[in-house]
Amino acid sequence: MERRIFGLENEYGVTCVFRGQRRLSPDEVARYLFRRVVSWGRSSNVFLRNGARLYLDVGSHPEYATPECDSVIDLVTHDKAGERILEGLLVDAERRLREEGIAGDIYLFKNNTDSAGNSYGCHENYLVGRHGEFGRLADVLIPYLVTRQIICGAGKVLQTPRGAVYCVSQRAEHIWEGVSSATTRSRPIINTRDEPHADAERFRRLHVIVGDSNMSETTMLLKVGATDLVLRMIEAGVVMRDLTLENPIRAIREVSHDMTGRRKVRLANGREASSLDIQKEYYGKAKDFIDRRGGDAVAHRVLDLWERTLRAVETGDLDLVAREIDWVTKYQLIERYRRKYDLPLSSPRVAQLDLAYHDVHRGRGLYYLLERRGSVERVTNDLRIFEAKSVPPQTTRARLRGEFIRRAQEKRRDFTVDWVHLKLNDQAQRTVLCKDPFRAVDERVDKLIAGM
């Protein structure tokens, strides 16, 4: 697929703290957070003017789903816009708490595990053609996805019975099967529930739920960009080596616990390979593919970062990507802190630092401290992120949805929207079904808006 539709959904961890003690239950905090949303949207599940969806997910986790994007750079920008929107709700909720005499700070974390060991996710969505063999897609993707954490994990200090260890992925401990149609009970690598949110005869939506949430813009670019390249190769019929894993679930944990990328995992054919071996195989194929077919600036940037990350892991010279890959950035931050204060990895102060990296409050979060210092590379910029808070991508269906919502709100009309429907709740109940996510212009929608 030359042009692909991408979408990211991020669930956020939420807590309210007063002098180090939890003051409100996550449920109550979430209600405060969403009070402003409910006051104008009459619901805690709304679509916004930028085409995105914001809602309270299972277990009081605020979730932001980006609008449909057809470029990875746009996707990164819109994912960050979601962070800013939630940061705005946080500031608003803290103010309201103070007015009600409840002292405390609300924290929103863009991470994947809380201290109680609960996991919440970052889900990636890729539009793929309906004609292909979905089973083959999964077969080729799973070894790639299991080992991909070595290039785009968010990193985590894991407390184990044998002491603390630094893992490259947060999600890996919580994945229980390879391919499944459930997302919460047993967490699979690829979710097959067939809701394309598009013309079902032409498209399928590949729903990848194994990835970590990223703070780093460049890590996000690599995560989605490399996956897109792998999908393009599968779609083009590139012959891939059979790297089917004997036990993907055991492998995903083994890979996560090995920062060197050298630990061997068993393949179904009886051979063994390390996460580095497997990633190098996919990277090599992708590089040949782009060398032969040509690629845009984004594809070249993705390949460059992919190669450097693999080299950094292989040589142990993590400085090569310390400004670009989340788990490396965080690992070096923790190591510097430990050396300075002579702390063991199991220290609560290290756990605090680990968490603070994911704080989305720009005046408080450690990732944003690094960004202000110019210590991390970027893909987008603050102006584009600010714009994306209210302006949808202009080249996809999100433009139609965003425009419809904006006009209906300005005219104070009652409306209902989802990913494919735009409906005016008047006597005529006029509804437009937008089945093509690539279409940013539609005269039926223009007519609907004009008739408000």
Curated annotation (Swiss-Prot):
It comes from Thermomonospora curvata (strain ATCC 19995 / DSM 43183 / JCM 3096 / KCTC 9072 / NBRC 15933 / NCIMB 10081 / Henssen B9). The lineage of its organism: Bacteria, Bacillati, Actinomycetota, Actinomycetes, Streptosporangiales. Its EC number is 6.3.1.19. The keyword Metal-binding applies. Keywords: ATP-binding, Ligase, Magnesium, Metal-binding, Nucleotide-binding, Ubl conjugation pathway. The active site is at 57 (proton acceptor). Pfam families: Pup_ligase. It comes from the Bacteria. The reaction mechanism probably proceeds via the activation of Pup by phosphorylation of its C-terminal glutamate, which is then subject to nucleophilic attack by the substrate lysine, resulting in an isopeptide bond and the release of phosphate as a good leaving group. Catalyzes the covalent attachment of the prokaryotic ubiquitin-like protein modifier Pup to the proteasomal substrate proteins, thereby targeting them for proteasomal degradation. This tagging system is termed pupylation. The ligation reaction involves the side-chain carboxylate of the C-terminal glutamate of Pup and the side-chain amino group of a substrate lysine. The keyword Manganese does not apply. Pathway: Protein degradation; proteasomal Pup-dependent pathway; Protein modification; protein pupylation. This is Pup--protein ligase.
